[in-house]
Amino acid sequence: MKNYLVNKKNTNEQLKYNKILNVMAIEKVENIEEIYIDFKAEWKKLSLVQRVDLLINSLGKDSRKMLPIEKIIQLVSIIPFVEHSTHISYTSPFSQGKTFQYSKIFPNSKVISSGITEAALFYNKNRGEFGILKNYDIVAFDDVQCLNNDTIASAVYDFLSSGNLSRSNNVVNSISCSSIIFLSNYTEETQKKLENNPYFLKDINLFEPFSDSFQKEAFKSRVIVLPAYLMRDENFIISEEDVYGININVLHKFFQEKLKESLPLFKIELFCKERLKN
């Protein structure tokens, strides 16, 4: 077996997080650099299909149980792991591992499960300190209902379009490339409608879980709406010992390397404007 691969059988003894992580070893790897070099060499040899399946397996889900559309949805949900400033509205039924994915799979992420102030999230004027969005690559709101006032909404709109943490021109280095993930669950009634006809959305508000402050087009047009309602109500968690995924330590290093290569769209726009001036 490749030194960067693990399966359920050889990780059970060290398992400490959650059954979703059965596929990945969580012990520290001392020779991580050597293993990572081997991994990258092997990764180049894999076909697109093999890469997709290996990534999904590495998230703790059995790719063999998933339909092609479900694999695509799963991959889109982890774009923020490798691309800066990718903002996603991820609404789905309960118990699909949404919160776990953003709190454990990516090394520099923060999940917020309660209310938060604008100062704590963006910039504290009194202290002259940046908030959470400056310190983490991914910030996920476990319940979008905690974002329930116009002040927060307005600041979020600005951030989604510009990456700016402060509306003051006097604050230096106030740009952040963090991605924001909005996690929520549909009501039982909406979920049934989506299950009956997931492609007829005329009478369904996909932003139903959000407060009134976030029902404006300025918000809706700036986030990716993940169609997680197309996922079957199945248990995709790996249960067999013949399914292999990437060791979590190697996976973390892989995501971090790809993220460093990423350039946010608003930075590309600023770069183009500067080029035009010159």
Residue ranges of model-derived segments:
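N-terminal pre-Walker A segment at the start of P-loop NTPase domains
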Residues: 40-84
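Conserved AAA+ ATPase small/helical "lid" subdomain
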Residues: 222-278
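A short helix-turn-beta junction within AAA+ P-loop NTPase domains corresponding to the substrate/partner-engaging
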Residues: 193-234
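Conserved Walker
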Residues: 128-129, 161-177, 191-194, 207-216
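Walker A/P-loop
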Residues: 87-117
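Extended, charged/polar low-complexity intrinsically disordered regions
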Residues: 1-58
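Conserved AAA+/SF3 P-loop NTPase catalytic/coupling segment centered on the Walker-B
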Residues: 135-160, 175-178, 185-197, 218-219
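AAA+/P-loop NTPase substrate/partner-engagement loops
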Residues: 106-150
